[in-house]
Amino acid sequence: MRDVVPGCQYVGMTDAPRETGPGADLPQLDDDAVLWSAPPEERAGRPLLVLLHGYGSNENDLFALAPYLPPAFVIAAVRAPLSPPFPTPGWSWFPIEGLHASDATAATAAAEAFASWLRGATDATTPVGLLGFSQGSVIALQALRLDPSRFAFVVNLAGFVADGDLPTDGELAELRPPVFWGRGARDEVIPAARVAHTIDWLPRHVELSGRVYPGLTHSVSEEELADVVAFLGKQLDALPARE
C-alpha cells in the first residue's frame, strides 16, 4: 500500500528500526530529517504547522504542499520513526496491521514519540496545528487526544481515529478544537469500520468540518487542497495576536 499525494517522493529501504509488535517502544524522531519552511531566526512569534506523512512515504511527501499553504505558518515536515518490512519503501508510524486491529497501543506510542519531538522543537507558547495524511492523520488525532490543550487544530486527510478510550478524551470533548476531515468517496485503503468509527467519534469530541470528495481515491486532490487552505486561513484568523 502507498499513500499518494501530488508531488510525493518515495525512498528505498534503510537501516532504520524495523516495525515490531504494537507494544514495542518507538525510537525518537530524527530531528535531522525534519524539513522546515523557515530557518530558526525566522520562526519566532509565528504559528507552527506540522505535517505527518502516511505509511511507506517520507517527509518530502507532504512538504511538497508547503508552497500552497498559508505563508504565515512555519511548516515542519517530520519523518516517521519506523521502516516498514520489505518491499515497502519509506517510513511508518506503526505496523500496517494497525489498520484493522482494535489495539491502539502502537498509535499511542507513536503519538507520544511525536509529542516528545515537538517539546524539543518549539516552546510551549507557540500555537501548533497538525496536518496528517492517512497513517499520519491517525498520529495527529492521537496526539490531539493525548494533549488536547496543546494543539490549535488538526487537518485529517484520508485518516481515522484510533480505537479505544484515553483519559484525556473528556477534556478534548470540552475544548472541542476544530478538525477538518477530508476523504475520498472511492478510498479503498482505509477499512470501512475505521471510517464508521471516525464518523461516530469525531463529532462528539471536536468541532468537525470537512468533505467527502466524489471520485477521489486514497490521495489528495486540488479541490481538497483548496478546502484545506481555506480551513487553515480560518484557523489563522482565530489565533490570538502575539507580540
Which residues does each PLM region occupy?
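Gly/Ala-rich beta-loop-alpha elbow adjacent to hydrolase catalytic centers
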Residues: G132-G136, A140
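Short, proline-enriched alpha-helix->beta-strand connector loops that line the catalytic pocket
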Residues: T126, E174-V179, H205-E207
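Serine-hydrolase catalytic machinery in alpha/beta-hydrolase-like enzymes
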Residues: D25-T126
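Flexible "cap/lid" loop of the alpha/beta hydrolase fold
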Residues: P87-P95, L99, G159-V179
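C-terminal catalytic histidine-bearing segment of alpha/beta-hydrolase fold enzymes
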Residues: A193-E243
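Conserved alpha/beta-hydrolase "nucleophile elbow" surrounding the catalytic nucleophile
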Residues: H53-Y55, L131-F133, G184
